[in-house]
């Protein structure tokens, strides 16, 4: 009997539990809410909102307002100074550094001990449970897992708190037993210089029996390329012949899938998506033949949803899980044991099923183009690019897009800045196909493109090699959970990138 068969027995009871939970998700959610409310009564925030008198979801929704980071920032700042019982009972030592708001360079998301145990680590364990259920002949524990994390700093001039990328916090606090099946060593994993880190990871993993890898697709790809360079091999499965799964999250995998398939040729390779963020762990791909993810309903996370059609209303409709419908684009709202109360996380999702509750990430509440009523979201962009790439034998490495509100000819259009790993057979044809497919999948975009009256044909600017890497490096944002903003209603980001893109060539 191999080691995976032995270790796998520890996950059997949870596999059965998850199967039963799929049928009782709503009841589980109300249990979660009751438990969080009970804990919240013992906090300053709970007393402020009279949580001791809240017994039902309706009372909860009436007592606590919807919150953004700015709304909770004052309380979080006090927690970081060491004050206790503010948003969550006791003191919270760890804070996950996340991309900033309009007013601040960074957000510092509290990560309580309860949140680590009952959200983040529970999610990691369930990934393994669901993977082993999908792949019963797995041998993943016969080797080691490469976990690609960010870095953490001991403070940000605040002596009572520790700050870092979520992945670094998880590595720092992980059960010591996990270190026996994990690489690289902690010192390497927590390095802040990503370019040094990836070289060291490559050196440390050569000759190791790596069976599974975990991380953000863009940064992991960079590490794997370095592994190939150091090993002088052409495929990863020549270096690690027993590699079998990539647990990925953070950004959409679709633009990177082809590149992974080119460097990992093994027919036994699997890809499993997760939805984890600084704010919590929310979804796992429970069926490898279905790209949707299962909403994890028995963690310390209570979910609510705002239809995006109402998101910018003064008083939008907010619904609990039992009120969602398939195919509607929702902004997600969470209440967690990390002290996030009715927190608008900034992601949008669409349910593909409600029995069980399965969904796909569709984008960000602030990452879209709606300059002319076209309501283009990331899900549209990813599908449009995939369609154009397939038809023109192209591969996209990175991209961003923004509107051109009016050029010298008084024309409005969308401008796409795209870095290719494989250039299209015909860039003009690629551009036409992208524009065509966006119209096919987005009726609002189609209406605005009608006869070129409101919107002209989109424009593609070809990015030079490593443009986006160099731009992120200039911002000090290599590695970890940093990512390129895909869609933006404003031109600030794309203008910065265009300035970096010397000798770029505009294609129609």
Question: How would you name each of these model-derived features?
Answer:
Residues 1-52, 60-67, 75-78, 82, ...:
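Active-site glycine/GP-rich loop and adjacent strand/helix microenvironment
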Residues 123-128, 289:
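Short, basic alpha-helical nucleic acid-contact segments in DNA-binding proteins
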Residues 129-178:
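Conserved AMP-binding loop of ANL adenylate-forming enzymes
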Residues 96-102:
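Conserved helicase ATPase motor motifs in RecA-like P-loop NTPase domains
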Residues 84-85, 104-115, 238, 245, ...:
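Non-catalytic, beta-rich accessory domains that mediate macromolecular interactions or localization
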Residues 108-110, 114-120, 247, 270, ...:
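Long, hydrophobic, well-ordered secondary-structure blocks that form the structural core
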Residues 27, 31-95, 106-111, 118, ...:
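Active-site diphosphate/adenylate-binding microenvironment
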Residues 105, 141-143, 242-243, 269:
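Short coil/turn connectors at secondary-structure junctions
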């Amino acid at each position: 009997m191999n080691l995976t068969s032995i270790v796998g027995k520890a996950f059997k009871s949870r596999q059965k539990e998850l199967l039963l939970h799929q049928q009782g998700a709503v009841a589980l959610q109300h249990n979660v809410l009751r438990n969080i409310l009970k804990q919240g009564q013992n906090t300053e925030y709970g007393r402020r909102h009279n949580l001791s008198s809240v017994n039902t979801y309706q009372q909860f929704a009436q007592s606590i307002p919807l919150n953004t980071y700015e709304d909770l920032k004052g309380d979080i700042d006090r927690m970081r100074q060491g004050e206790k019982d503010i948003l969550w009972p006791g003191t919270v030592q760890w804070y996950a550094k996340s991309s900033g708001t309009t007013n601040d360079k960074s957000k510092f998301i509290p990560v309580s001990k309860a949140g680590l145990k009952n959200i983040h680590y529970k999610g990691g364990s369930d990934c393994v449970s669901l993977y082993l259920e999908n792949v019963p002949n797995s041998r993943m524990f016969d080797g080691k897992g490469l976990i690609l994390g960010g870095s953490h700093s001991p403070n940000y001039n605040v002596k009572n708190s520790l700050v870092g990328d979520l992945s670094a916090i998880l590595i720092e606090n992980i059960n010591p037993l996990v270190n026996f099946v994990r690489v690289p060593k902690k010192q390497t994993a927590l390095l802040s210089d990503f370019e040094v880190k990836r070289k060291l990871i490559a050196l440390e993993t050569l000759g190791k029996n790596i069976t599974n890898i975990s991380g953000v697709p863009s940064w992991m790809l960079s590490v794997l390329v370095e592994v190939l360079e150091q090993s002088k091999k052409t495929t990863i499965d020549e270096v690690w012949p027993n590699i079998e799964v990539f647990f990925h999250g953070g950004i959409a995998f679709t633009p990177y899938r082809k590149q992974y398939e080119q460097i990992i040729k093994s027919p036994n390779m699997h890809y499993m998506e997760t939805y984890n963020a600084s704010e919590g762990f929310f979804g796992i791909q429970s069926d490898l033949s279905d790209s949707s993810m299962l909403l994890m309903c028995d963690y310390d996370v209570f979910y609510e949803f705002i239809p995006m059609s109402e998101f910018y209303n003064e008083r939008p409709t907010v619904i609990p899980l039992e009120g969602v419908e398939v195919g509607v684009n929702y902004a997600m709202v969470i209440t967690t044991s990390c002290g996030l109360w009715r927190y608008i996380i900034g992601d949008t999702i669409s349910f593909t099923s409600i029995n069980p509750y399965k969904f796909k990430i569709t984008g960000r509440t602030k990452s879209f183009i709606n300059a002319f009523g076209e309501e283009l979201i990331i899900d549209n962009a990813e599908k449009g690019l995939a369609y154009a790439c397939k038809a023109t034998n192209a591969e996209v490495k990175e991209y961003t897009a923004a509107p051109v509100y009016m050029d010298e000819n008084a024309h409005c259009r969308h401008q796409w800045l795209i870095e290719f790993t494989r250039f299209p057979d015909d860039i003009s044809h690629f551009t036409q196909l992208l524009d065509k497919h966006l119209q096919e999948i987005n009726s609002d975009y189609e209406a605005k493109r009608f006869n070129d009256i409101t919107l002209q044909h989109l424009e593609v600017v070809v990015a030079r090699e490593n443009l986006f890497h160099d731009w992120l490096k200039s911002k000090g944002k290599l590695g970890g959970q940093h990512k390129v903003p895909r869609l933006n209603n404003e031109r600030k980001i794309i203008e910065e990138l265009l300035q970096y893109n010397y000798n770029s060539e505009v294609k129609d």
